[in-house]
Amino acid sequence: MTEISITTSVPDAGAPPSVVGGQVERAKVSVRDLNFYYGDNHALKAINLNLIANRVTAFIGPSGCGKSTLLRVFNRMYDLYPGQRATGQVMLDSQNVLDAKLDLNLLRARVGMVFQKPTPFPMTIYENIAFGVRLYEKISKSEMDNRVERALRGGALWNEVKDQLGASGLSLSGGQQQRLCIARTIAVRPEVILFDEPCSALDPISTAKIEELIDELKEDYTIAIVTHNMQQAARVSDSTAFMYLGELIEFGETNKIFTSPTDRRTQDYITGRFG
């Protein structure tokens, strides 16, 4: 892995992927000169970074610094709210996420999201998984059964619920509900998964399961996670971005960010001097 200092520019889309340690590293998402506004409030300021395919990128920083806002730009969740707008480019492979003509339903299938609190639908465990699949595909009952099982296995939940698929998703524990939401997300076969503080409402045991799952999921998906837990960021991520007041202050390999940051503000935040 290479060490990356704060990113001031992003390679052209046509640039060849880098080769590190014999492995090809490819940007799945390239953010270029991204600015975001809540009305007149300039919430994100000239953000430039790459999310490398099949790696976990953690976003850290104090509350209100723009971490969750940035995640919501990646799949255009901000479109649900009036008065919010983004400028610049967010390239998902060769497609600009900010293109006004983009099909948002298809975008959100490609870029899934898991929220801070578990959000299971008020329906059975089986239907929680099948619901999203039906929005995009018409498949047979046997194919759906297989898809549900694969998704629940991918969410590390199958062995716990395989005999109660007809039970309500709301009957599960908090940790199980969050893994159900992860399974629901991967059921539609996304390419990128966004985690917005996925463990903040969970106990330590459930948190450990989610972190282990994230490590497994990066084999198949590109992952971005927002967290206020410094230890969690250090444990689960390959790269870390520190944000402050809407700016990307420093971005690099997680080990370097936590052991030898180049910006004093990063060091002060990591060591608890503010935040």
Curated annotation (Swiss-Prot):
Matches recorded under CDD domains: ABC_PstB_phosphate_transporter
Membrane topology: Peripheral membrane protein
Function text: Part of the ABC transporter complex PstSACB involved in phosphate import. Responsible for energy coupling to the transport system.
Pfam family name, one: ABC_tran
Source species of the chain: Rhodopseudomonas palustris (strain BisB18)
Family: Belongs to the ABC transporter superfamily. Phosphate importer (TC 3.A.1.7) family.
Catalyses which reaction(s): phosphate(out) + ATP + H2O = ADP + 2 phosphate(in) + H(+)
Enzyme Commission (EC) number: 7.3.2.1
Gene3D superfamilies, per database record: P-loop containing nucleotide triphosphate hydrolases (3.40.50.300)
Protein name as catalogued: Phosphate import ATP-binding protein PstB
Domain ABC transporter: 29-270
Coiled coil stretches, renumbered: none
Keywords for this protein: ATP-binding, Cell inner membrane, Cell membrane, Membrane, Nucleotide-binding, Phosphate transport, Translocase, Transport
One GO term describing the cellular component: plasma membrane
GO MF, one example: ATPase-coupled phosphate ion transmembrane transporter activity
Residues noted as binding ATP in the record, renumbered to the chain: G61, P62, S63, G64, C65, G66, K67, S68
InterPro entries: AAA+_ATPase, ABC_transporter-like_ATP-bd, ABC_transporter-like_CS, P-loop_NTPase, PstB-like
Protein localization: Cell inner membrane
Complex and partners: The complex is composed of two ATP-binding proteins (PstB), two transmembrane proteins (PstC and PstA) and a solute-binding protein (PstS).
GO biological process, one term: phosphate ion transmembrane transport
Source organism superkingdom: Bacteria
